[in-house]
Amino acid sequence: LVENPGNDVLYFLSFLSLSIIDENNILGVVMKDTFLRNLVCLCTVFFLLPTHISLAEVDIIKDVLQTIDFTKEMCVVSEEAIQKTYGDDPFRLPFFNDQLRNPLETPSILKNNIDYCIANRDSIRNVHWYTSYRLGYMVAAYPQYEPTFDHRIVESAPLLYAISDIYTLHQKPLSAYSFSLLQSKTKDIPVDVQKEIAKVLYASMEFELARDKAFATASELDLIKAFRNPAAILMEDGWDEITYQIASDANFGQLYFASIVLSHHLDAFLQILPSLAIPDSTSFSAETPMGSIQIHPAKDTLHTGRNILFSLDLGGNDTYLNSAGGNDSWFNPVSICINMTGDDTYEVQDPSVYSQGAGVFGFGALVDMQGDDHYKSIQYSQGFGCFGVGILWDQNGKDTYDCDNLAQGAGIFGIGILHDSAQSDTYHTYSFSQGFGYVKGFGLLMDDQGDDTYIANDEDVAGTNPQSSDHNTSFCQGAGFGRRADLAEGNSMSGGIGMLIDMQGNDTYSCGVFGQGTGYWAGTGVLYDQSGNDSYKGVWYVQGGAAHFGIAMLMDDQGNDTYDALLNMAQGAGHDVSLGYLIDREGNDTYTSPNLALGGGNSNGLGFFVDAQGDDIYQLRRTNATNLGKASCELFPKTSWRYG
């Protein structure tokens, strides 16, 4: 017994429970003679841990395990047993396997990754590099060795010759007459501005070449089909063989190397842009085989054009009814939209348009540098990547983000990033958003400051959730999701990485089923809130709850926080060889908890709940519940449930 420095309403310390299941010994535990051969579930609830000390360094965990002759080294999940049971899965991420081998190291592993993102949050290039690295691609490791394209710049007319080179690349060289017309259009743009834009254009050309090589084994017809329906393979009740084959054969490393280099040059352009002397009246437009290149004057502008390669708006309260940093076709592989100032509106009503920082078999980036902005779309937007990279980078302002699904930092076979730097923002969606990663995907949402509101709508219920028709399937706010097919044709695909990082402010989070740090089918989901008095409200598999080989963590460092979960498997809970963590490091917190919560493990699941400090209140929704460090088993699994 360890003395509690706080005045918790309920006192619990170091519970550990065992049950009898797991004929395949998937947990891979080495048993002593005094224990039964088949070990089942491990779940613990730890209080009184030193603040800001990683779990890997806390001796109390090791001490508790040793009371039953169970060491940290024995607490592993057998990759061989999983492979034997479910077959080989080429989509499983090394990042997932690292945590599978070291379940008790997971908080330290994830926190180190969070710290990297925070430290590099001002660099599009570095954040993008991190996401590709965690997907298993060690490329572009040293920025100083990345191509600069300086040798290709024609100092007297950089933009003119860069555009001419685009035509030459596509075997459509400009005629002398067209070259002369273009020359007259570019001459009034300051040369230093031309030079910086030209570097971005050369990086875009290199990206197109790399993109074509990355998908060289796929037929043009298959690529067009996959481009038109990027979510065809998302749901378990459907099967898209074309997308599966493209994903199996694609050279993602080559793709991401080129997109990181492009991000590097975009960073450089954004850094120098405020110092460039660009007249407010500057206006320019030119068509190219990769899309149009545009500069808009500092006034209120209505943007409706499509297939845009590069767009720079110098100011004004603008309205974008177009893709705004989303690539519109296979032949528009790169789309970059930069807005310098103004309170802007970005709105797309067509669900087939990739917009507001979306890259589908391409690279899409929207950068808004200042102003109170409004972003609205149906799907495939606001930092969405599918076989590509999509980035929305908002540097200042009180903003609102609204979408239905697959947005706000969502990646499926790709990378989606949304970063908002300042002020209080509102994020609204229904599903598969706000830090969502599907197979071979990484979705990241980062917010630096402000009292933010994150909503995964659970009031307008669609009635399609397999757990409860009264709630929506969310997979939002830090969710990793994979395709489970052991009950179907067998083509299971391990999930990706979903991460939401909020650094400051009193924030509010709400979702339905699966959210707020959740993982499913070898997916990893993380929600990290650094400071503020925050509120978390969810339904099922939330707040560090995972199912079916998933990994989930919700970590809150500071503040007096409120956690409310309605149904099973929440607040540091793992089901079916899953790992769930809820870690609150400081503050006087309130927990309202269902069954199998606050350190709950079921069917070989591992659940950990850690409250390090403060005067806390624990309210249980039912008596005799399997929570607060208890484990259980399912003798008769409900196999008709798709998600748990």
Language-model-derived ranges and their functions:
Residues 292-296, 308-315, 329-341, 358-370, ...:
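Well-ordered beta-strand segments characteristic of repetitive beta-sheet solenoids
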Residues 294, 302-303, 311, 320, ...:
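Hydrophobic "rung" positions of tandem beta-strand repeat architectures
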Residues 352-357, 435-436, 455-491, 517-518, ...:
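Acidic/polar low-complexity surface segments
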Residues 299-302, 316-320, 326-327, 342-346, ...:
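Extracellular beta-strand scaffolds
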Residues 41-51:
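Bacterial N-terminal signal peptides
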Residues 261-333, 496, 500:
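N-terminal segments that cap or nucleate solenoid repeat domains
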Residues 32-40:
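Bacterial N-terminal signal peptides that target proteins for export
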Residues 57-206:
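Long, solvent-exposed N-terminal ectodomains/accessory regions
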